[in-house]
Amino acid sequence: MQMDVIWEDINANLNHVEELLKDLPESDIVVLPEMFTTAFTISAPTLAEGNDGITMQTVSQWAKKYNSLFVGSFIAEEGGRYYNRAFAAFPNGNKVFYDKRHLFLGGEERIFTAGSEPLVFEYEGWNINLAICFDLRFPTWLRNKDLKYDLLI
């Protein structure tokens, strides 16, 4: 989904996506932008959420309502650390998460903690691997044949 993300305004962005979804044709997978609720920002301490925060509550509702897999990322806080965390929210209410492994050296590494584990999950017969932005610059990470995925998002 293409959208103009409103700088550091979680509620406004959730409302904006809700409006865009009204005109979206039926879809198996809806892919939202990186940090779609805040835009890319280093204001993690004031904008971070847990995996059960307003972003994931809302996305889970959308997944069920539209019977689609929703994928995107948000600023997550866990154990006093901040992550650029990707999610996949399933129509049945399940959720899986991936923390961005390769942080951009323009300051992202000073705020966020890098993830350490890839994520491959199954949806509608497809094995799907999640990556976030700068991860794509590290093809050996993504070409790992042991991951056995069909689709990279």
Predicted regions and their residues:
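Short beta-strand segments enriched in small/hydrophobic residues
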Residues: 1-4
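Cys-nucleophile CN-hydrolase/nitrilase-fold catalytic domain and related Cys-dependent amidase chemistry
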Residues: 10-11, 19-91
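Short secondary-structure boundary/capping elements
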Residues: 12, 51-54, 111-113, 137
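Short, acidic/polar
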Residues: 12-22, 136-143
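Active-site catalytic loop in hydrolytic enzyme cores
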Residues: 77-147
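Short, intrinsically disordered, charge-balanced linker/junction segments flanking boundaries
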Residues: 147-153
